[in-house]
Amino acid sequence: MSSENLPQSPERAESPQAPRRKPRVAVVFGGRSSEHGISVVTAGAVMRAIDRTTYDVLPIGITTDGRWALTADEPERMAITDRKVPDVDRLTESAEGSVVLSVDPGSREVVYTEPGSVPKALGEVDVVFPVLHGPYGEDGTLQGLLELSGVPYVGAGVLASAVGQDKEYMKRVFLSFGLPVGPYEVVRPREWDNDPAAARERIVDFAGEHGWPLFIKPARGGSSMGITKVDSVEGLDAAIEEARRHDPKFLVESLLRGREIECGVLEFEDGPRASVPAEIPPVTSHDFYDFEAKYIDSAAGLVPAPLTEEQTAEVRRLAVAAFDAVSCEGLVRADFFLTEDGTFVINEINTLPGFTPISMYPRMWQESGVDYPELVDRLIQAALSRSTGLR
């Protein structure tokens, strides 16, 4: 990326009378996880929604090999086309240039470096809007870096992000707070590596107790990637291999028969509030609500969900309770099953839910009276008003 194409550093106010510059939002996206492409799509939607009369935007893409790259501010290129998701490598003009964020908590300075060139200061960042899904971004790693740097950021902190990414510990926290959780087993890397036969036998015993089919899923994944529905023991090995391709630790869950219900939580000045819930209807073209159903085939959810007043109140209460149990901040999407006996069971939360044009989280808040641009603005303003460090 040539120097003339680099974004200009925002002007500092030289006197109390000088106009204050607009807050600068760094939208960080991409990353090393298998959800790289969806992160790019989400970032494009967020960038389109940010009010440019109020904020400056600095797009920072992280390549699949972990390089922080300066990308063009062209959100229209960050969309699913021809059933293909975009990636950061196609959005950056330099294969070698890197963006560096200072870890000096008094700086907030961003610098662009390229081999053979003098580093160029890009100015300070006031707030980071991370839209990294999955490991190396949504799991507390990026949040830890931003805490070290003293840069405010949208969404959950280090602990809540880590718990929200690891389905095992998420369920443990839910259970400790008395939230209803379905049957599950965890197979850790050492268990599988040391004695896969014993681990496999434990899974078969779990199926004997709770019945087939089972869902085999990565413990620290998202967007339904790496999840397989297994109808019998014959499909078990392939499903485990697929899950471990995304994460060496995996979960085994029984099928909960019922309806899939989602609810958004957003932090307001007076505390977290829940949106109207949505329902994911059965997807006849897929075994379950998998990656393609979510993002490629545009499976439509029902917003609001056709629930009774009592059911709506209960799922909203549980969503806020899950938000509080994990000590979340900013936003969460909570996913539930409404079982055949009429009880809600929490499946998981997402601390950085998708913001693609068809994502359920913004749709639920749209129906609740908070449109997409206001939703993005509320999240940025909440981050700007919140300090880093212990809070």
From Swiss-Prot:
Positions that bind Mg(2+) 2: E348, N350
Function: Cell wall formation.
Pathways per UniProt: Cell wall biogenesis; peptidoglycan biosynthesis
Recorded name of the encoding gene: ddl
ATP-grasp domain segment(s): 171-381
The entry's keywords: ATP-binding, Cell shape, Cell wall biogenesis/degradation, Cytoplasm, Ligase, Magnesium, Manganese, Metal-binding, Nucleotide-binding, Peptidoglycan synthesis
Positions with a binding annotation for Mg(2+) 1: D335, E348
PANTHER family to which the protein is assigned, alphabetical: D-ALANINE--D-ALANINE LIGASE, D-ALANINE--D-ALANINE LIGASE A
Similarity remark: Belongs to the D-alanine--D-alanine ligase family.
Cofactor binding: number and manner: Binds 2 magnesium or manganese ions per subunit.
EC number(s) per entry: 6.3.2.4
GO function terms (MF aspect): ATP binding; D-alanine-D-alanine ligase activity; metal ion binding
GO cellular component terms given for this protein: cytosol
Classification of source organism: Bacteria, Bacillati, Actinomycetota, Actinomycetes, Kitasatosporales
PROSITE patterns documented for this protein: ATP_GRASP, DALA_DALA_LIGASE_1, DALA_DALA_LIGASE_2
Pfam families, per the entry: Dala_Dala_lig_C (PF07478), Dala_Dala_lig_N (PF01820)
Listed GO biological process terms: cell wall organization; peptidoglycan biosynthetic process; regulation of cell shape
Major site of localization recorded for this protein: cytoplasm
InterPro entries: ATP-grasp, ATP_grasp_subdomain_1, D-Ala_lig_Van_CS, D_ala_D_ala, Dala_Dala_lig_C, Dala_Dala_lig_N, PreATP-grasp_dom_sf
Gene3D superfamilies, sorted: 3.40.50.20, ATP-grasp fold, A domain, ATP-grasp fold, B domain
Species assigned in the record: Streptomyces griseus subsp. griseus (strain JCM 4626 / CBS 651.72 / NBRC 13350 / KCC S-0626 / ISP 5235)
Region Disordered, annotated ranges: 1-24
Annotated localization: Cytoplasm
Protein name stated in the entry: D-alanine--D-alanine ligase
Reactions this protein catalyses: 2 D-alanine + ATP = D-alanyl-D-alanine + ADP + phosphate + H(+)
